[in-house]
Amino acid sequence: TVCRDKQENLWQIAFRGVNDQPFWAAFSDAPKDDKERADIINRMIRIQLAMIKKATGEEDPFVRMTFYDELSDLLAKGYLQPPTGKNMLWTFVAGRRDHYPYDDLVSFDTTKQVKLGYYMNLQFTSTGAHLAPAEGPWKMEANYRYVNTRGPLTFSVVNAGNLREFVMEMSANARMMWDMQAYNTDSFLIDFCSQYFGQKYAEEVAKLYHDYYYAYWQQKLSEFPGMERQFIFQDLRYSRVFDQIGKRFSDFSPNPLYDIGFERVPGRSFRIDGNNQVDSLIAGMKKTAVRFEEVSQRCENLLKRLPKQDQRFFRDNLAA
């Protein structure tokens, strides 16, 4: 239908399994070796590309491939060999659980004839902040600034399923994509707060947003050069901690937490530094609870002073 009606289309090639898992999780006879797995993907995506070329009649149709989870690992190892071309769009994906430029992007050969894309989860049910924003616009900017050093950004995706709580972060990304050179997160935040809460309260609200994000427990020191808050203990991690500890409440262990299913990197589900998870959790929660309590109290005090028409959005997007 797309070809018959001559609709512009950005085609996608991929080979993954059911439920957003690697294909070898779906096929019992799949190879066990990473290189052999990548060889199968390499063949499959070239078959798909040939089908697209035949259907469109174009030698260089606009096609993208997204390097998600296992694909990014295979690409970083050099096993995955995606097609190249002037209209081929390689979409790199921020690291799972904690969102930062991953190894495949860091090692990307910038001489390849491809266009560059980036996919970052601001909110995602299984891999990051879920009901409360946590990444923040500063971290978003740091990600995209780095991406742009690897080549001109052609395509961008920010993922968020729960929109209400993530409006500010998504707005920041939209502003940055509109004019990356001029964008500055601190300036954007003042503009955003002026628009929704008035100039009188803009600086006060902007400071609250900043202090909210920096109240999160950073359970592991940053490893990516120049990136603040690379690892943060967002709400999805809290939820999983309560679930896992609850199931083993009667049997004490200093390390009761375990990786979620299909976790490819050991320890990535929680990324807690140290050899005693319980002690680390208690120490981390003591610090972050005080910071969040202070931000919460300031929010409540400001809420009473805001114009009535601005209170609901303030409550939904920040105070709650």
Feature roles, as predicted:
Residues 1-64, 75-87, 161:
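Catalytic alpha/beta active-site cores
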